[in-house]
Amino acid sequence: SPRDTVLSTLPRRRPRSRAGCAPALAAPDSVSDALAAALQAPVVNCGAAQLDAQRLAPYYAAAETMPLWVSASGAGARAQLLRTALQNAGQEGLSPVRYRIADIEAYWSATTPAEQACLELLLTAGFDRYSRDVRRGLTGPHEADPSWQLRPAPFDPVAALQAAGTDGDLARLLETLPPVHSAYARLRTALARYRRLAEQGGWPPLPAGPKLAPGDEHEQVVLLRARLRSEGDLPLFALSFGTRYDAPLATAVENFQHRHGLHADGIVGTRTRAALNVPAAERAAQLRRAMERLRWLPRDFGS
């Protein structure tokens, strides 16, 4: 349709070169001029990114099309605050790719008004999507289970950004967009740990074998001990060696079982072995799903 094929007056830009980036029409004199021109079209094309102008226009309505992040001298302190938040979206269980961080990086050092307008709109689009995702969730509760009646609290990102008038206000807004529950903070800390473990290769699976109980002698005890040390259930300083299933190892198994909702009897049976063999990457994915569910809940558990 014509709506889908309309291009803005902004240029395409390759990440490593500005060659061929002349505007389709006369070059705008300022970032504001370029913004005004871009927002006239349904679709703004910035390199490979296609931005919905109608979605972005409300951010500029109250500001009379004045840029929110970028000036003639380039990206400002507010832009850097947002850039950092988008780069670190993985800490919230979200993907920076979803917020076009690569496109933002490609335009970060833009010098022409048209290219700076692209950076401006990419940042606004990133804020719009990120703020909604981290505040209310990527999906709704009903998509996980139609019977759930959870209703995330209303959130207006345009109003929130307008209220963040100073750099300090914006920093506080970005910090408080995620859930403020202590449970969410614990999940975020755990996610960082399991992401590191996954990046380091995780842990080798425990091969199929017999049930292991305290006092047993078995070659797999060495593997079990290494596995439990990888997650910290067995402290590195624990005096536990050899192929005998000793008391420190039994305590470590019980710790692991308790953390995973298993019967904490210290015996490595079928269910405990299966839990031990869940990869670190899958544990990280489980934490991301738990963080997503917390985003659906009221900001105050008592409300």
Specify the residue positions occupied by each region the protein language model found:
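Auxiliary tRNA-acceptor-end handling modules of aminoacyl-tRNA synthetases
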Residues: 21, 25-303
